[in-house]
Amino acid sequence: MHKTSDHAQIVVNPFVIHGAALLIALLLQGFLPLPFVPATLARILGVAVFLAGIGFALPAARLMRSAHTTFNPNRATTTLLTTGRFHISRNPIYIGMLLNYAGLAIFFGTLWGLLLIPVVILLMNRWVILPEEEYLTRVFGEAYTTHKSATPRWV
């Protein structure tokens, strides 16, 4: 087991990145509205995309729980997961979060939210995922390097 002080040195919590982006999108939509799909369609699509995010992330979360490792990037990772959703992506929880973010943006009828997705991905890569990858390489060595070369970061 690893010391609890030994963890990825992320810059910003992933929830803060997604929440701030959604808030900025809603503010931009209020001040500089962009046309979007009708509200009823937006609600239906938004819920569908949001649920897809849960559907993608939930099996990964269950696998993490069964492996007794943490969801919290500020805690030590005890197990390298390479099966299930982690075979599809090294970051299935973050894919789920991104789909949740997109679903909320659609639900609230803000095209700005969708336009900000590349920014969210960029910030997640730089401030969260790269520090996590450095940490996982340090902790799991060749096993993580092999997983990293065989499995995409996103999809």
Name every feature range the model reports, one short phrase each.
Residues 91:
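Extended, alpha-helix-rich binding/interface surfaces that flank or overlap catalytic cores
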Residues 86:
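Solvent-exposed interhelical
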Residues 1-83, 95-155:
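Membrane-anchoring alpha-helices and their flanking helix-loop junctions
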